[in-house]
């Protein structure tokens, strides 16, 4: 019998149907419950998992590692200094070697093409832990967190504030509209999402009944907001743009004034982390000294408020990643969704 997920890679949200994406979210909730009750779920007993990290990570590495162990698999971390992707060895050759030694591969790096080549040539499921274009495993955690708080996804309005061109904004647009979530991007015109991403999201929205709004008008952006979401102003590899981004994005900071504009006491705040909400980091101190800004994309007040759900969201990275690995590699009985 054909299995829906077995052997498939998880590279971008657009590769999955609404039903498939929603199934993974619900399966994640089930695995979270099993974990909470101490029920073993060793669906990947005896499997070996390669964790390839071109870009450093706290949550993604921790989530994949603990998820693999919970599933009975052995995770092996291979950092930027351990792998030769495209340097001394082609991605194709590396993929073919790793595919003979490992049962599944996670990749977190810069190029979407690279993760696609790993999937094409390795012969095993490959999971995208983040590229410059997409962040699909983050989306499962985000929308699971939203569903936990509201009991549904369809009809919810999510407002993303900040750099509208980054991977998180791209993925929020596509995954959200795929599942009937209204997605507002509140961003300066210079950082509006790419036109092809917006068109893709609008196509999904037409099918799901959702709507897409890309605007630099705060009153338009916050209308009907159930979820405020933000991300760092400067992504990995863009550190030279700090001054430009601080000046450009200060009006798009998530603060209590913005929260109150939504006039919804039941709304929640999400952030994929890390967050620059104070000066308790080297980056935070550096930005404060150079630009006079002590809080960047979110104020400390909002970050620590009753609206905040980002630590639930971070925990959900592990449960959702576990669901993806189990569904695609665990030979589970999932004939259709």
Swiss-Prot record:
Its EC number is 2.1.3.3. Pathway: Amino-acid degradation; L-arginine degradation via ADI pathway; carbamoyl phosphate from L-arginine: step 2/2. Gene3D superfamilies: Aspartate/ornithine carbamoyltransferase. The lineage of its organism: Bacteria, Bacillati, Bacillota, Bacilli, Lactobacillales. It catalyses: carbamoyl phosphate + L-ornithine = L-citrulline + phosphate + H(+). Its main location: cytoplasm. Keywords: Arginine metabolism, Cytoplasm, Transferase. It comes from Streptococcus agalactiae. This is Ornithine carbamoyltransferase, catabolic.
